[in-house]
Amino acid sequence: MIYLRGLLSMQKIKWNIVWGIFITCAFFILLFIRLEFLHKNTQSVSPVQIIKSQKSQDTWMNIYQNGRKIGFVHRIFAKLEKNYHFNEIVFMQINTMGVTQALNILTEGDLNPDMSLSSFNFDLNSNLFRFNSHGNVVKNKLIFFMGLPGSQEKNEIQLKDIPHISGSIYDAAFQADLEKNISRNFSIFDPSTLSIKSIKVTRSSDEIIPIMGKRILTKKYCADFMGAKNCAWLSKEGDVLKETGILGLSMEKVSRQKAQEGIVNQGNIDLTQISSVASNVKITEPEKLEVIKIKVEGIGDLLSLNGGRQSYRHDVLTITREHLPPSANLNNKIPQDVALFLRSAPFMQSDNPQIKAQVNKIIASTDTAEQKARKIVNWVYRNIKKKPVLSVPNALEVLKNKVGDCNEHSILTVALLRSAGIPAQMEAGLVYLHGRFYWHAWNVLYLGGQWITADTVFNQIPADVTHIRLVRGDSVDQLNLMGVMGKIKLEVLEQTK
């Protein structure tokens, strides 16, 4: 997801302290693994074992990108008389498309005596945008509220087991006392995407590493999340001393004074650039191409390369530009399975009065489905300022602030189109610009009995064929991109106008 030609992209990373930067639109950062629940398929540690081993902690860590400090983490875990309290503050300065922005994240909560989750609060602030999620566990339900402060939506998730939470996945792995070369799956809950995912953690060989002027014997653990690898080094007491992730991100335990020292904000590497993929040829006027063939390497089996305008065989991806039938022959009869994509959804509030009111200003009741779609795409293109932002994309907030990168553009477009009676989804992958392919997000909408791509950053219906779809769906589905970040290679074989 990028911005380019004036466009930007930004990715969201949600990370429990460095576990990983996953880039989705200039894509940028937002905390990926936040709350971890030891779930049904996890061999959980008994409450007695956990209580005996847990102690109060006050830890500071620096966050680095290729050796340059870009932020810090302050984590407090307090053992109280009858329960526990955790608090984690993250501060980062992130460079996307040459723009450095500050990101502040707070995660805190209370734990019951048996270490099960009682309540939590997650708050993210960056420039114009703010996101909050808070809630508690009631019997077999996680009940929580998400969105803009003052106008939050209630959500519930059924839990098959009583959830537990630890400061990080590695704390849980340490408490499980994994033997060397043994793996275990842990389930995590991400409050910004309403999803529960599985992470595989493996105990590696012990290593001696330098930390705070000392050489310390550590236990090494590596986590695999959807193909992306992150490693951590823990002390014999279980303190996380160091973490490394993709795109040159790492964290290391330091003193409070060291953590609070200044951050280098000049010359930071642009993650949008380093996560992009080189092209072997120059593509001129991509909007005029009818067909493109690209050899694709370094991908897994979780991606959505086949279907619609894309055909993938023997490592070669063929993308053919769609063509709408003449308006007179355009029948927008919507099948039942497609009608699912007319529904309002978290962050895509198509039934909200503000969204409906904006749609009524954009379209006319006499417009055809195609006319409605083109008017909405054009309105988003002209009225949403193209600027990289650090946020949890939310259609209502984008409509209010009228600024954002490709994620913000595409999520607002989904809400507007659905409100206008046009089924719509998000797609994510790569798009060509100035000799490289950048991560990007756009839309797909149902017109004339077929799914048609649309890009409100470029004002295109259909989107040009250099848009390479890797996933289709919301931010949960976009997590599948983590496994190919830094691995995918592209070779353009043919271009046909």
Predicted feature residues:
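Active-site lining segments that contact anionic ligands and/or coordinate catalytic metals
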Residues: 218, 229, 237-240, 291, ...
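Acidic, serine/threonine-rich low-complexity disordered tracts
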Residues: 9-139, 150, 175-330, 334, ...
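Short, Lys/Arg-enriched N-terminal segments with co-localized hydrophobic residues
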Residues: 1-9
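Cysteine-centered nucleophilic/redox motifs
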Residues: 376, 402-430, 443
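Secondary-structure boundary elements
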Residues: 166, 330-404, 412, 474-476, ...
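Active-site rim recognition segments
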Residues: 252-265, 271-276, 333-335, 419-422, ...
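Acidic/charged, solvent-exposed loop-and-adjacent secondary-structure segments enriched in E/D, K/R, S/T
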Residues: 148-167, 376
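Solvent-exposed loop/turn segments at secondary-structure junctions
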Residues: 383-386, 406, 431-434, 451, ...
